Curated annotation (Swiss-Prot):
PANTHER family: SUGAR FERMENTATION STIMULATION PROTEIN A (PTHR30545:SF2). Belongs to the SfsA family. It comes from the Bacteria. InterPro entries: SfsA, SfsA_C, SfsA_N. The lineage of its organism: Bacteria, Pseudomonadati, Thermodesulfobacteriota, Desulfovibrionia, Desulfovibrionales. HAMAP family: SfsA. This is Sugar fermentation stimulation protein homolog. NCBIfam families: sfsA (TIGR00230). The gene is sfsA.
Length: 242
């Protein structure tokens, strides 16, 4: 069996989702007690945060952190055989693209031998810069996808000015002769294709297709989420969300 690229740390726990407070705090119950969990997801997590649903949390690496747990995933459609996990930790795509690069599992990055995270370009800081002998610099920006509508995995799940800025930056990169790639990690199993959520953020959706026409590469990969961790799955085809 192939090794999972991003195993969860030891000591993860499941509990019952109660509520979300002030965007970055989530209350869950575990063994009858209330536990507060940190969420780094600023999106709406539309359709996922249902009271009574099972959630997965990992222990904080820093034992002195105010909230001792980090929100990793939500169970969708119950705990039975029809249910599945949806990964909600927005740091996962960045870690996944790096792990997949070093494991040789990014076909669109073949030939590149240097991966540098969080690199500055002008006034922006992008998630990764890849370089290789005789190849144009490849800039990568990562996004987490948790929403599926009518079998289409969609991004974003809330209006994102920052996301629109990133698309403009990527188009500028291509115009200057370098490569630019968006890495969308769809952390759920039920979407069969991927597209921008024009109903939620029409500006982002318009810029997405403008970026495609300009030569920005779109790489929506499936993330295979289980209680053991997250692995990288197949690339999803693009479609328009209508």
């Amino acid at each position: 069996m192939r090794k999972i690229l991003l195993p969860y740390p030891a000591g993860c726990a499941t509990g019952t989702f109660v509520r979300r407070v002030k965007r970055f705090s989530v209350e869950m119950t575990r063994d009858g007690e209330s536990v507060w969990v940190h969420s780094n997801n600023s999106g709406s997590m539309l359709g996922l945060l249902r009271p009574g649903a099972t959630m997965l949390a990992s222990p904080a690496a820093n034992p002195d952190r105010k909230l001792a747990w980090t929100h990793e995933a939500m169970r969708c459609h119950g705990d039975g055989p029809q249910g599945f996990w949806v990964g909600v930790n927005t740091s996962v795509p960045n870690r996944m693209v790096e792990a997949a690069f070093h494991a040789g599992r990014l076909p669109w990055a073949q030939g590149y031998d240097t991966f540098r995270r969080e690199r500055k370009r002008g006034d922006s800081r992008l998630d990764a810069r890849l370089d290789g002998p005789g190849l144009p610099t490849l800039w990568v920006e990562c996004k987490n996808v948790t929403m599926v509508e009518d079998d289409v995995a969609c991004f974003p799940d809330a209006v994102t000015e920052r996301g629109s800025k990133h698309l403009r930056e990527m188009m500028d990169i291509v115009s200057r002769g370098e490569r630019a790639a968006m890495f969308y990690l769809v952390q759920r199993p039920d979407g069969v294709c991927f597209g921008p959520a024009d109903v939620i953020d029409p500006q982002y959706a318009a810029l997405f297709w403008e970026a495609v026409d300009a030569g920005v590469e779109m790489h929506p990969h499936r993330g295979i989420v289980s209680p053991a961790g997250i692995d990288l799955g197949e690339v999803l085809p693009l479609t328009r969300c209508r």
